[in-house]
A protein has these predicted regions:
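Glycine- and acidic-residue-biased ligand/ion/polar-headgroup-sensing regions
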Residues: 59-71
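Short, charged/polar surface micro-motifs in flexible loops or helix N-caps
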Residues: 33-36, 44-49, 70, 116-117
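A generic "binding-loop/recognition-motif" signal
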Residues: 59, 78, 94-95, 104
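Double-stranded beta-helix
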Residues: 99-131
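A short, N-terminal "cap"/entry segment at the start of jelly-roll beta-barrel domains
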Residues: 1-38, 123-131
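Conserved short histidine dyad/triad with adjacent acidic residue
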Residues: 26, 40-58
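Short beta-strand His + acidic residue motifs that chelate non-heme Fe in jelly-roll/DSBH
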Residues: 73-74, 90, 96-102
């Protein structure tokens, strides 16, 4: 077995396909990553968590890197914009959500440590970003 794995982004399952605009692709599992979790997200205009929910984690720190566009982030009680080339680290216990208000798509890479039960580590924060 080789000590590496290669996949094209288009080969990674888009979990949003047919259900929600844009893309979310959990690259981690399809490249057999052992220690690092990596997710690609494409967000068309008016998609994300604004007007509804946010989330936090029990143990996963996350780093969001903006590949394209300009995105609004709500982190605890602060709202600010990040654009292409910006990165933000968010501690596990910190509530967060991302929104795209711009006409062009926003694209993100989200990186964290790989854990056994990612769904069990995520805590939904209802009514987090109500306008």
């Amino acid at each position: 077995m080789a000590g590496y794995t290669v996949r094209k982004l288009e080969e990674v399952t888009n979990i949003f396909e047919g259900n929600y605009p844009g893309e979310m692709r959990f690259i981690t599992y399809e490249i057999d990553a052992e220690q690092v979790a990596i997710t690609y997200r494409r967000m068309p205009q008016h998609t994300g968590g604004k007007g509804s929910y946010g989330h936090r984690h029990i143990e996963q720190e996350e780093i969001y890197f903006v590949l394209a566009g300009k995105l609004q982030f709500k982190v605890d009680d602060e709202i600010f914009e990040l654009e292409r080339g910006d990165a933000i680290r968010i501690a596990p216990e910190t509530a967060r959500s991302v929104w795209n208000d711009e006409p062009e798509d926003g694209e993100l890479i989200i990186v964290s440590k790989k854990i056994d039960d990612p769904q069990g580590d995520s805590v939904l924060v209802p009514d987090f970003w109500i306008e």
